Amino acid sequence: MRIALLTMGSRGDVQPFVALGTGLRARGHEVVLGAPEALRPLVEQAGLEYRATPGDPDGFFTMPEVVETLRRGPAMRDLMKALPPAPEEYDQEVLDRIERAGEGVDLVVHAPLTVTTALGEPSTPWLSVNWWPNTSTWTFPAVESGQRRMGPLTPLYNRLTHWRAEREDWGWRRAEVNEFRGRRGLPPFGKSSPLRRLGHPRPHLYPFSPSVLPKPRDWPGQCHVTGYWFWDQPGWRPSPELEDFLADGEPPVLLTLGSTWPVHRQEEMVEYAVAAARGARRRLLLVGGPEGALPGDALRVPSADYSWLMPRTAAVVHHGGFGTTADAVRAGVPQVLVPVFADHPFWAARLRRMGTAARPVPLARMNREALAASVRTAVTDPAMAVRARRLGEAVAAERGVENACVLIEEWAETRTTAHTPG
């Protein structure tokens, strides 16, 4: 089969598809991966065919509207309201470019930011993926609600948060989808979102661990929690400086904020993190972050293979993005999450409830004392360390990519005609 994996966004939106694409290729399939131009080197490093999709992952988090809004709080609705409206013709060009990236294949796998194009009823069969659990359930609140507790909340409340999130999401998408459909001679959708049926007629894959979040019993049969999709960088080697730093003392505290670094008050964040690590009698290791001089008990590296680095640390402080969270969970070390937006508060609440992460310190409420207290707990709590290690062992034993490949292949075998919409 020739399969297109289409995504937009930051590295965290692309690397899981690199893992999936590598797995599919190993099983004899041809794979093309659509991603923003800035992430082309990542796709090509994995030996996958690259196709361009729109987006500037670096530019988004430097937009003044984004920085100002996220420093106030993580709510998606506030962020969407703050963004300047895009011209209608721009929205349609984005959808057209995504559609073109998926041409000439037997099957398309859509990520959250590209699935809208599937509502134009293409002739190529498609299925979908989401990094966080966006299927309605009585079991837990909607990710988009920003709810910081995983329970005890009433099932009715949980369901209402999903209804509201679905309504708001469709409110943002509806006009551009109907314009897209209209240009293809298709009737418009009404007020009810067709995306609510993801996981009913075709697979809707969730590449997180069932050890972290089991599949709710009220989800449709075609919603699948596969396990994480890991891609460990082939041939990656640490620098001599990094190896020397790690060898020169006890495991350090790791601080990595991924693509959200620009949203933070970066120098202040580093200052707080250095102090927090010292309070736990540890050194600090940064991945990314601001350039500039650091004290002797801290080191900055521009990037790293987390599968190698994280198990060599005492605790990981991170933003709670899907990919970084997965790596930290598999590493089996305690965590401190600094949620910024989207799914970050959800994973922070979940890991806190599981006892593998200390109290989260949201960006909007960041202060020296709170970060120090959480880092100290993560480094010194022996029960948390045991729980984190056991969870890491369970996740490491899962076969997320293999599970996803089998599901894709089995469903594709049943497809001999074009799909039905929605």
UniProtKB/Swiss-Prot annotation:
GO terms under biological process: carbohydrate metabolic process; lipid glycosylation; vancomycin biosynthetic process
GO molecular function: hexosyltransferase activity; UDP-glycosyltransferase activity
Coiled coil: none
EC number: 2.4.1.317
Job of this protein: Involved in the biosynthesis of the macrolide antibiotic tylosin derived from the polyketide lactone tylactone. Catalyzes the transfer of 6-deoxy-alpha-D-allose from dTDP-6-deoxy-alpha-D-allose to O-mycaminosyltylonolide (OMT) to yield demethyllactenocin.
Keyword Transferase: yes
Domain of life per record: Bacteria
Record protein name field: O-mycaminosyltylonolide 6-deoxyallosyltransferase
UniProt entry keywords in alphabetical sequence: Antibiotic biosynthesis, Glycosyltransferase, Transferase
UniProt keyword annotation of Transferase present: yes
Disruption phenotype: Cells lacking this gene produce demycinosyl-tylosin.
Family membership noted in the UniProt record: Belongs to the glycosyltransferase 28 family.
Phylogenetic classification of the source organism: Bacteria, Bacillati, Actinomycetota, Actinomycetes, Kitasatosporales
Catalytic activity: 5-O-beta-D-mycaminosyltylonolide + dTDP-6-deoxy-alpha-D-allose = demethyllactenocin + dTDP + H(+)
